[in-house]
Design a protein with these regions (language model features):
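Glycine-rich phosphate-binding segment of PLP-dependent enzymes
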Residues: 31-39
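Intrinsically disordered, low-complexity basic tails/linkers immediately adjacent to helix-turn-helix/homeobox/MYB/SANT
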Residues: 8-10
């Protein structure tokens, strides 16, 4: 299934079986429970009780109170299609020591896409549309972008956490 993107191109969605959706949802709950405490306050995408609206409210408060002066917009081109599996597995293993969960994750990543009876396999990327995809995205971006941004700009930028507020 495809949905239109803002640039006019199409985005492929991974449509899973009902059984896979149930298991992915359960794994998403587990991963969220483990990683939610690690995610930065500035990260609002695909998180409980957070949304683009909460990010905008926080940014507005920062601008009104003069502790946020700049906004940096980050758009990772073809993000879901280019997630490195080896790094994603390392990031998950950093906090989760469950071989069964890691095996499930590997199966989902390697499942491929069937279109017109032909299965296309990939060596990278996270399928969009599955219940576990948003939390996997947040885990990957936490280590690859959020922590780097915090370390790189924390000392030179007051209100650094808000610069990433609109991610997601």
């Amino acid at each position: 299934m495809y949905i239109p993107k803002a640039n006019g191109k199409l985005r492929a969605l991974g449509i899973t079986t009902i059984e896979d959706r149930v298991v992915q949802k359960a794994v998403a709950w587990v991963l969220s429970a483990v990683f939610e405490q690690d995610f930065l306050d500035s990260s609002h995408g695909f998180r409980p009780n957070r949304s683009p609206h909460t990010a905008l409210h926080r940014l507005r408060d920062g601008m009104m109170q003069h502790w946020a002066k700049y906004v940096v917009e980050v758009d990772v081109v073809s993000y879901f299609d280019t997630v490195n599996w080896a790094w994603l597995r390392k990031f998950v293993r950093h906090r989760v020591n469950d071989g069964g969960l890691i095996r499930l994750l590997n199966k989902w990543l390697k499942a491929g896409v069937m279109e017109n009876g032909v299965v296309t396999l990939s060596a990278e990327g996270v399928p969009q549309g599955g219940p576990v995809s948003p939390v996997l995205s947040n885990i990957y971006l936490h280590y690859v972008l959020d922590l780097w941004f915090e370390r790189r700009f924390k000392k030179t930028c007051r209100g650094y956490a808000e610069l990433d507020a609109l991610r997601g």
